[in-house]
């Protein structure tokens, strides 16, 4: 992010403008932040496979525009080595799905995703145990791929799923995530600000940000989320909450007349999302 913003070329020292243009003085700054709530509190998920090979994920996690339900489908499909279109997600019904802290504080993909992955792994374990009971082959000697049971010690030996799960039977796995407190997402933001020393006008003229997002499950959505936050700058430069100094009441007549910028007024801005292995599920 620092390289993308050209920080070394622009920063001249604290209190020193990076450049000047008439009455306008330009300065650069940076800010760091961390969001530590994504792994907290427990999550629980059930994953069920039918004898026809379809898979249903039961979770109370709610789709609120981030694509999290598609993320669960990807995670479970990858764990079970089956096409994504064979995986569905149940409606978010707390009376039918396992208890969960829910979709809040950026935890849906991290906490719910790990819980879904563990449920898929538990489903495979139960499937291999059932194969041992019905075919007499140790559970440790099985693999599951493309909807077929394959023997590890003899790759030529392949069994259809319905040989183990007799129609209309099904098999389920459960996944639990207890929650942790150190799955922190790190962010850095660089901005260039122009201040007119005669009029006092403040303008953001350039921005570049960076995020450590862990494992990126949906690259386009992640990039869009990181860049679309830019409208939040208006909280700092175009909005003001006036407080009564005696009783701390808000004196603004209303909260609906903030001067939001148009798309054409947005300065150049970009963002880079980096992957890391911090807090990644590895058990």
Cite the ranges covered by each PLM segment:
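Conserved short loop/turn motifs at secondary-structure junctions
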Residues: 61-62, 117
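Conserved beta-alpha junction segments in alpha/beta enzyme cores
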Residues: 27-60, 66
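Conserved strand-to-helix beginnings and helix N-cap segments that scaffold or border functional pockets
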Residues: 69-70
């Amino acid at each position: 992010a620092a390289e993308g913003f050209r920080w070394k070329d622009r920063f001249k020292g604290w209190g020193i403008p990076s450049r000047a243009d008439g009455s306008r003085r330009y300065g650069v700054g940076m800010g760091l932040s961390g969001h530590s709530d994504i792994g907290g509190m427990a999550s629980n998920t059930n994953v069920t496979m039918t004898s026809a090979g379809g898979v249903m994920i039961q979770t109370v996690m709610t789709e609120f525009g981030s694509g999290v339900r598609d993320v669960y489908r990807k995670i479970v499909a990858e764990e079970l080595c089956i096409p994504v279109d064979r995986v569905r997600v149940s409606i978010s019904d707390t009376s039918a799905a396992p208890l969960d802290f829910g979709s809040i504080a950026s935890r849906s993909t991290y906490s719910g995703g790990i819980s879904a992955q563990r449920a898929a792994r538990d489903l495979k374990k139960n499937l291999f145990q059932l194969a041992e009971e019905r075919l007499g082959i140790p559970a440790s000697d099985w693999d599951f791929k493309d909807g077929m049971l394959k023997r590890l010690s003899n790759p030529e030996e392949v069994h259809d799923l319905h040989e183990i799960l007799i129609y209309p039977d099904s098999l389920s796995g459960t996944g639990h995530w207890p929650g942790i407190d150190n799955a922190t997402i790190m962010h850095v933001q660089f901005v260039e600000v122009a201040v007119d020393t005669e009029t006092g006008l403040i303008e953001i003229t350039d921005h570049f940000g960076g995020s450590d997002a862990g494992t990126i499950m949906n690259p386009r959505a992640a990039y869009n989320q990181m860049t679309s936050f830019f409208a939040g700058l208006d909280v700092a430069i175009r909005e003001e909450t006036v407080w009564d100094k005696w009783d701390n009441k808000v004196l603004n007549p209303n909260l609906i007349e903030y001067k939001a910028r148009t798309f054409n007024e947005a300065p150049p801005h970009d963002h880079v999302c980096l992957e890391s292995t911090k807090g990644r599920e590895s058990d």
